[in-house]
Amino acid sequence: MDSEDNSAPRGERGIEQFSHVSVLSQEAIDFLAIRRGGTYLDATLGLGGHSYEIAKRLGAQGHLIALDKDTNALEMARRRLEQVPDDLKEDWPQITLLHASFAEMKQHIASKSLDGVLADLGISSMQLQDAGRGFSFQAEGPLDMRMNPHGDLTAEQVVNHTSERELADVIYEFGEERRSRRIARAICRARPIRTTAHLAQVISVAARPMNQAERRIHPATKTFQALRIFVNHELDDLKELLASVPSRLVPRGRLVVISFHSLEDRIVKDSLRDGASAGKYELLTKKPVTATEEEIDRNPRSRSAKLRAAARK
């Protein structure tokens, strides 16, 4: 999961006011092995960092399709991708930006043959830094957590209207939090909870760190992760994406996935392994690629990143 930034002011801001560096960017580009004139899908557009690097290598005959659930991110990425250097303007590819989730990908690219697919999973620094989105436990904000601002379910609804048992199950399953029942009990007793700060305070009291290992992360980290994953159907969407990709990749087309926690990585690992066993993929990464110490020093959020890649047979 991404590291938190408690210095960020609340509210929507322009792209220049957010700090976001794409993780494992060069490694992702290398594994994609981009073909000039090819068609590529960036399944997690974000602020467009990876998409920009892909676009620079595609050429005027190429086509980049990029999608994101987050309408705010789409608009910011659009502005970034329109800032084409003069020496690349005549060689810039066609770019199609789509407001869509992984699960909706099939209906948008049903007729496309893709040379490569990139997915950089999880939450972006931009989303964490905007306290108004409700993703961070280090800033006061509404309990929202929707990646798609127009989605129906919010974290506030889950926190305040889910039974104690169901809430504990969510925290355990999607946060891998062994203190889930204690935390769920404390949340239910503290209802109504309307803000991220209030929720973080309730969790911190209920799950005080008892040893050095527990002190390494904030007590609310896993619960906030669980709520975010549940609200946004992140793991179901990831499974949909991975199931859809093989039928859309051309022979030798590449799939590259960057994950940030064990739940995501396990799904990616199992999917690629099963695809290789079924003769669909050649695994390009026997073990996940991780960030160098130099990158971790520059960008601490890269510490937990794992990249896996495969080529279509």
UniProtKB/Swiss-Prot annotation:
Belongs to the methyltransferase superfamily. RsmH family. One of its GO terms (molecular function) is rRNA (cytosine-N4-)-methyltransferase activity. This is Ribosomal RNA small subunit methyltransferase H. Keywords: Cytoplasm, Methyltransferase, rRNA processing, S-adenosyl-L-methionine, Transferase. It comes from the Bacteria. It is found in: Cytoplasm. Its main location: cytoplasm. PANTHER family: 12S RRNA N4-METHYLCYTIDINE METHYLTRANSFERASE (PTHR11265:SF0), S-ADENOSYL-METHYLTRANSFERASE MRAW (PTHR11265). Residues 290-313 are annotated as: Disordered. The gene is rsmH. Its EC number is 2.1.1.199. Residues 301-313 have a biased composition (Basic residues). It catalyses: cytidine(1402) in 16S rRNA + S-adenosyl-L-methionine = N(4)-methylcytidine(1402) in 16S rRNA + S-adenosyl-L-homocysteine + H(+). Specifically methylates the N4 position of cytidine in position 1402 (C1402) of 16S rRNA. It comes from Koribacter versatilis (strain Ellin345). GO terms for biological process: rRNA base methylation. One of its GO terms (cellular component) is cytoplasm. S-adenosyl-L-methionine binds at G48, G49, H50, D68, F102, D120, Q127. Gene3D superfamilies: Putative methyltransferase TM0872, insert domain (1.10.150.170), Vaccinia Virus protein VP39 (3.40.50.150).
